[in-house]
Amino acid sequence: MRFVGRLGTISSALLAGLLAGCGSKQPDRVAAAAVEQPAFTVAQTTPLIGDQKVIRLKRKLVDESKPQFVSVELLPGRGMNVFQITAHVPGLGVINLLESPTLDVARERMNGGENDFNGNESFQMGGAVLVPFANRLRGSPANWQGKQPGSELHANHGFILASGMTSVRTETDNSHAAAFAVLQAGDFSKRWPSKMELSISATLSDGSFGLRVTAKNVGEEEMPVGIGWHPYFTIPSGDRAQARIIVPARQRVLVADYVNVFPTGKIEPVAGTAYDVSVSSGLRLGKQHLDDTFAGLSKDDQGRLEIQLIDQAARYGLHIMGVSKDINAVQLYSPAGKAFIAVEPQFNYADPFSPVWNGRDTGMVHLKPGASVTYGVELRLFVP
C-alpha cells in the first residue's frame, strides 16, 4: 500500500518504520529530560527586603508517600531570617512550616518605622537569627566583667535583626542547596565590648534543613556571645489543644511576670508541674500559655539536643535538633488560642548579665580575640 501526500509517495513499510522510530525515541527523550531536571535549585527573587533579594532554596519532590522538605526562603537583608520553610506532608500536600505573612506584607512591615525599631518586626515572623545575645536584655543593670554593654533599656533578640549581610553566595549539587552569608558586625555600633564577624549558612538536603551561625571575635578585647534562633512553627492541623511538645529539660526559669518576661533568678524543677515538657508523651499544649525558658537540658553522647513537635491530628512530626554543645536553654512561646509555637534553642538565659543571677553561669560564651564559636540546629520530619 502507498500513501500520497504533499511530500510525495511513501510506502507503507517506510511509514511504519518512521512511526516505529518516533515511538521508540520519544520515551528516551522524556527520560533524558527527567534526568536533566536538577534535584536542587537556588534562585534569588523579588521583592527586595532590606535592599536585598530573597534567596529561595528548592528541592524536587521525590516520593509523595513520605514527608519531605520542599523549599526554604531566606532574607539576607534582614539578618538572614529563615522566613519560610515548606514541606510535603502526606494527606496535606505542600504546607508552610513557619508562621509568616506573604513576602509583600513582610516588606511593608520591615520598613524601619516605629514598629520596626531595631528590626523588631524580624522576630515577629519566620525564624530570626539572634546575635550577640538571645532573648531579652535590660540596658541599665547589664554588667559584664565590670562593663556596661550599651543596649537599649529593654532590647530583644540581639542586634542583627535589621542587618543586611555583607556578602552572600549560594551553591547546589545533586545532594543539597545552600546559601552562605557573612556579616561584618563590628562592635554593633559601639554596643558590644569587641568586634564580631558572623558567618551564617542555611542548607536544604535530602532529609533535613540545617542552620549554622559562627561568631568570631575579630577585635582586640574579650567579649561575651549568645546565639539563638527564633522560628515560629505552625501546627498544621490548626488544633493547638492536641499538639504536643517534648523538650528534654529538667528545669524552668521563673519570671516576674509575662509582660516584660524578665527572670527572677530562680529556677525550679519541672517534674510534677504544669510545665513538664520532659515526659516521653510530651506536654499537651491545651489552653496553656507558654512564654518560658527551660534549662537543665539532657543531651546525647555527642552533645546534641533533641526536641519534638507532634501534631497527631495532621500525622505530622518535627525533630528540632540542637547540634551545639553550648546550647543551654530552650525558650518556648505559644499564646493560648494560636496555632503556632516558637521553639528557640539558645546559648543563654534571658537577661544574662542581670544581678539576679548572683554570679550563676547564664550560658554566654566568652570569646578571646581570634576565637570563634558555632551554633547549629537541624530539622527533620517524621510521621508520629
For each predicted feature, which ranges?
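Extended, loop-rich substrate-binding clefts of extracytoplasmic carbohydrate-active enzymes
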Residues: 33-61, 143-206
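Bacterial N-terminal signal peptides that target proteins for export
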Residues: 1-11
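Short, structured beta-strand/loop micro-motifs enriched in basic residues and often containing a Trp
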Residues: 131-132, 353-359
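Beta-strand-rich interaction surfaces with strong enrichment in secreted/lumenal proteins
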Residues: 199-201, 362-367
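Active-site/ligand-binding surface loops and adjacent short beta/alpha elements
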Residues: 124, 232-324
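Beta-strand-rich N-terminal accessory domains
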Residues: 27-145, 301-327, 371-382
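Acidic, contiguous internal or C-terminal segments within carbohydrate-active enzymes
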Residues: 57-81, 85, 89-91, 183-236
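C-terminal motif of bacterial Sec signal peptides marking the signal peptidase cleavage site
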Residues: 20-21
